[in-house]
């Protein structure tokens, strides 16, 4: 049958290989790259220092507001798993309130019980100094999201803090909680670029469920199957000689 002839499978294998070969190379090369650096280095975690712990003596000395006062002020429902955390933010003790269902976190001054607003650019840079081994040079508040950005998946606004080293390093700081949201370096950007090639999502860089990836995955399977069938047919032909 001509449709199932060796010539047909040879041509099918050749054309399928031509179509998917570049993407197969991208999958292999990016997979090799992903296996080399430690993922913690990609995320910049090696630059983080230990988070300062709450000093009990400091709490007693500064006479902080009782947690029951914050519970009443923020109208917290403990039965709904809403929480109050005592933390440091830019050198000050704060209460961080997390409501349920998830809303924007609320911050209260632990000394006065008053609600607090965003940290300043100077405070954002001081947090980078305190929480990392990096030296900040500038801080800018980001309010607008951008498809495929370095800070995608994180709530805005964020402070974008530029540091001296590593070169082109950026630290993103949450202006509400004062926490380090992300650290981005050239290594992370290389990883992110190759990740977009790997999953074939060149804009958002996070979506596995898109037609292009499915198409080339299916073509890759067909290429392998056609090669196996071609090998099988070739073996039968040679054995018949």
Regions found by a protein language model. Give the residues of each.
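Conserved histidines in hydrophobic membrane contexts and catalytic metal-binding motifs
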Residues: 1-241
């Amino acid at each position: 049958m001509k449709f199932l002839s060796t010539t047909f499978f040879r041509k099918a294998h050749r054309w399928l290989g031509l179509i998917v070969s570049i993407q197969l190379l991208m999958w292999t090369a990016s997979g090799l790259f992903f296996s080399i650096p430690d993922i913690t280095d990609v995320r910049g975690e090696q630059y983080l220092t230990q988070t300062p712990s709450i000093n009990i003596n400091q709490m007693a000395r500064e006479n902080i507001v009782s947690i029951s006062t914050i519970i009443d002020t923020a109208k917290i429902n403990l039965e709904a798993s809403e929480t109050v955390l005592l933390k440091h933010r830019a050198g000050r003790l704060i209460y961080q309130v997390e409501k349920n269902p998830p809303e924007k976190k609320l911050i209260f001054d632990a000394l006065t019980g008053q609600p607090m607003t965003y940290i300043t650019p100077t405070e954002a840079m001081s947090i980078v100094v305190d929480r990392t081994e990096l030296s900040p040079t500038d801080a800018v508040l980001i309010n607008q999201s951008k498809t495929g950005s370095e800070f995608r998946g994180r709530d805005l606004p964020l402070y974008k803090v530029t540091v001296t080293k590593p070169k082109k390093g950026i630290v993103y700081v949450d202006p509400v909680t004062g926490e380090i949201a992300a650290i981005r370096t050239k290594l992370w950007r290389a990883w992110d670029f190759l990740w977009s090639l790997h999953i074939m999502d060149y804009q958002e860089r996070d979506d596995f469920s898109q037609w292009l990836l499915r198409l080339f995955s299916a073509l890759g399977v067909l290429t392998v199957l056609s090669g196996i069938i071609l090998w099988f047919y070739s073996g039968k032909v040679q054995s018949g000689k």
